[in-house]
Each structure stands twice: as C-alpha cells, then as structure tokens.
C-alpha cells in the first residue's frame, strides 16, 4: 500500500492542461503538486502511476507501444530487432510496454534527474542506460554512448508540445535514427492545428510535408482524462525515416 493519498481537486472552471494539479496527503501533510512538476511527482514512489494511470486512465504508453508493434510487424520486421531511444522517458512506463512486446534493447534520455531515479528505482531492468540531460547538449560520455549505438527507433510519448521537449531536442534525437528507422510519438490534437502557432507543431507539419517523416499510421485517441473528467484527445503517429 502506498504511504500517501492523492486527491483530484473539485474544479468548476476548466483548468488548462498545463495548469492541472493534484492534492497529495503524505505523513499527515497536504500539498499541492502541478501535473507538470514532474520532479516532485517522480520523487514519491507510486504517485505517477496512481495519478495518471489509475485516476486519470492514461493510455498513451500502451497505445504507442501497440501501434509501433503493429506497424513493425506489418512491414515484415520484428520488434525484437529494434534498438529504441526513448526520449523524455520519465519513469519507464513506455519502455516497460515495449519490453512486454518483445523489444530487447532500449536506451533512455530525460532532462529530469528524478525521472531517471524513478526508472532505476521502479523499473531497473527496462533500459540498458539512462542518460540525464538535454539530448542536443549531452555530457560527452552520454553523447558518445548514443553515437555508438545502432539506434533504429525513436519513441517520445506525452512529452511534446508543453515545452517539455523543445523542437531542437526532437531533431537531435531524430538525427540518431538511420534511414529506414522508426519514429513513434504522440501529441495533443490541437497542437497539430496550424492555428496554434506551436513551434513543435510547425516542425512536425514541416517534417511530414517535406518527407522527413513518412507516416505509416496516425490515430486520434483519448490520452487521459482531465481533472474534471473530460477526455483529452491526442494523436499517435508512427512513421519511418526515409
């Protein structure tokens, strides 16, 4: 049993997704934690899973892993042969889903130290290495490790569009994938709308338009529920690098 209780606030007005928060009761003390304060959430063992998987029904790790597996197999290939770079890997829930489907080699990158600590604490057998830092400016040993790997697939789940991972970081990770490699990610549906003006959305539209991403499948689905119980639609994309 976890040593905490987590409550969702009673919200009359709609909070934007990057303003959402929960109330954590731990050791008799209550504190408010924003959903995007990942370091705080990862520091409490089991809080991320309780909050996002249990209470808010987050389905993205399973969705991306399933769609990627389906497309790889449709192409006559095996997920067991993939060497995955999981960008914005968090506490390893995406990597865990990929492992369950037969992926044998995974390396993680996240800018948040607490994310790496949580993955090593809770899912120590998922990643071969877990590097902490900005992938576009990693320490030399981490950069050398990634360069020496035969990365064939990039995954980036629930980490794009709110400033969590900037376009430059996504491009740096994309550059590690060879021709014919796989790219699987998700993004809030409105971020792909031209009217949003999001730099990342503009990058994705550009990469699809100029052929740097050849989309194999694209699916709109419910990423999770909001604190008020509304469905949050996201778009999952599995593509190949030409």
Model-derived regions, located:
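N-terminal auxiliary segments of SAM/dcSAM-dependent transferases
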Residues: 1-34
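Conserved alpha-helix/loop element of class I SAM-dependent methyltransferases that forms part
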Residues: 58-80
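Conserved class I S-adenosyl-L-methionine
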Residues: 79-90
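Class I SAM-dependent methyltransferase SAM/SAH-binding core
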Residues: 85, 93-141
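A short SAM/SAH-binding and catalytic strip from SAM-dependent methyltransferases
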Residues: 151-166
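A short glycine-rich, Lys/Arg-flanked "PGG" loop and its adjoining helix->strand segment in the class I
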Residues: 168-179
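Conserved beta-strand signature within the Rossmann-like core of class I S-adenosyl-L-methionine
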Residues: 180-188
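Class I S-adenosyl-L-methionine
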Residues: 209-242
């Amino acid at each position: 049993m976890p040593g905490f209780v987590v409550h969702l606030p009673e919200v009359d007005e709609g909070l934007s997704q990057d303003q959402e928060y929960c109330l954590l009761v731990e050791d008799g003390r209550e504190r408010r934690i924003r959903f995007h304060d990942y370091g705080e959430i990862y520091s409490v063992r089991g809080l991320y899973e309780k909050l996002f998987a249990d209470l808010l029904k987050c389905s993205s790790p399973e969705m991306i892993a399933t769609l990627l597996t389906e497309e790889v197999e449709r192409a006559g290939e095996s997920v067991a042969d993939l060497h995955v770079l999981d960008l914005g890997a968090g506490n390893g829930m995406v990597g865990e889903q990929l492992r369950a489907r037969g992926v044998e080699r995974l390396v993680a990158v996240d800018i948040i130290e607490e994310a790496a600590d949580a993955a090593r604490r809770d899912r120590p057998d998922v990643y071969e290495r877990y590097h902490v830092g900005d992938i576009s400016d990693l320490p030399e040993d981490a950069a050398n490790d990634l360069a020496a790997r035969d990365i064939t697939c990039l995954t980036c789940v629930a980490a794009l569009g709110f400033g969590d991972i900037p376009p430059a970081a996504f491009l740096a990770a994309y550059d590690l994938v060879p021709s014919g490699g796989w790219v699987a990610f998700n993004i809030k549906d409105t971020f792909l709308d031209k009217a949003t003006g999001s730099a990342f959305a503009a990058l994705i539209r550009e990469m699809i338009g100029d052929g740097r991403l050849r989309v194999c499948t694209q699916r709109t689905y419910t990423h999770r529920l909001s604190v008020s119980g509304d469905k949050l639609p996201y778009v999952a994309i599995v593509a190949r690098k030409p």
